[in-house]
């Protein structure tokens, strides 16, 4: 991995039946990675990791299309629906040996992705754990 001044970030996004919102929110997550990398806060090797949690719609197909369109998108697929927390855990376990920072966020766009800037800054300043609470 890198040092704290050039960390690799993985944004872990659990997805269950997200075919409607995924095409809207995925580019926002990618733009956040690109913006943070362009500002020198994270490594350009950072990724957006989608975890398909046994969706019954086109979610997994869309994740595969995204991954084929840009190397910064990656995805894993659970064989069946295991629940939100297990999907987050699966993503964290997948990412743990590939990055310095993991941030989990829901796919629906209800959380402020700009909060990631402060989280990355806190990590770069020496924090090992940073969390946000929606207000």
At which residue positions do the language-model features occur?
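Structured catalytic core of nucleotide-sugar glycosyltransferases
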Residues: 1-135
């Amino acid at each position: 991995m890198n040092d704290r001044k050039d960390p690799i970030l993985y944004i872990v996004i659990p997805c269950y039946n997200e075919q409607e919102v995924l095409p809207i929110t995925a580019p926002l997550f990618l733009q956040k990675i690109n913006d943070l990398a362009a500002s020198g806060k994270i490594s350009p090797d950072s990724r957006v990791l989608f975890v398909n949690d046994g969706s019954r719609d086109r979610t997994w197909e869309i994740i595969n299309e995204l991954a084929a369109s840009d190397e910064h998108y990656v995805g894993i697929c659970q064989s069946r629906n295991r629940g939100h927390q297990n999907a987050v855990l699966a993503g964290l376990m997948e990412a743990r040996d590939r990055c310095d920072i993991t941030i989990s966020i829901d796919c629906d766009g209800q959380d402020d992705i700009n909060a990631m800037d402060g989280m990355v800054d806190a990590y770069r300043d020496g924090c090992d754990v940073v969390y946000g609470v929606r207000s």
